[in-house]
A protein has these predicted regions:
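Catalytic glycan-binding domains that act on GlcNAc-containing polysaccharides
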Residues: 20-169
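N-terminal, intrinsically disordered low-complexity tails/presequences enriched in Lys/Ser/Pro
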Residues: 1-33
């Protein structure tokens, strides 16, 4: 029995991927960039429909997570649980953006003009805050995630993120 031919490659996606791989500066090499972007692109498709937006988002996540010393897949799991990838999400307590950053942080660091619905800005804040809590918790991820969410002492949120992380690894 003959195996079916692979689906034809979408030329638009090929062009976008090539462009984003060439711009991906947080990867060790182009092969790693291409492999990771392709793998994550397929998983992110249900949340972000436009291929260019998906790849741009993934590059930003990889860059900010790597800069903060985090695994990009963990950051994707946090985003899935926090906002379902909605950059305009606002929680009942006022947290904003994909990583649901509390706006008081802007004034705390003297940057009240920062826009937390800007993906790069939100990722930068969120990744640094998450990394800080991981360090404070001596690497205990469940505790760090509970601190990040403001639910320290309860691990329901942490369990949700860990479950989501399984899907991104």
């Amino acid at each position: 029995m003959l195996s079916p031919l692979p689906q034809p490659v979408d030329s638009e996606l090929r062009t976008l991927l090539k462009s984003h791989v060439e711009q991906a500066d947080s990867f060790t090499d182009r092969f790693d960039a291409e492999a990771w972007l392709m793998l994550m692109d397929g998983r992110l498709k249900r949340y972000i429909k436009a291929p260019d937006q998906r790849l741009s988002f993934l590059r930003s996540v990889h860059r900010e997570a790597t800069a903060a010393g985090l695994k990009p897949e963990l950051v994707l799991a946090v985003i899935e649980v926090e906002s379902h990838f909605d950059r305009f999400a606002i929680s009942s307590v006022g947290a904003q953006g994909v990583m649901q950053v509390m706006p008081f942080w802007k004034s705390e660091i003297g940057r009240s003009e920062d826009n937390l619905t800007d993906i790069d800005t939100n990722l930068r804040y969120g990744c640094i805050i998450l990394k800080h809590y991981i360090d404070v918790a001596d690497g205990h991820l469940a505790e760090a995630l509970a601190r990040y969410n403001g639910s320290y002492g309860s691990y329901r949120y942490s369990a949700k993120v860990m479950e989501a992380w399984d899907n991104w690894r």
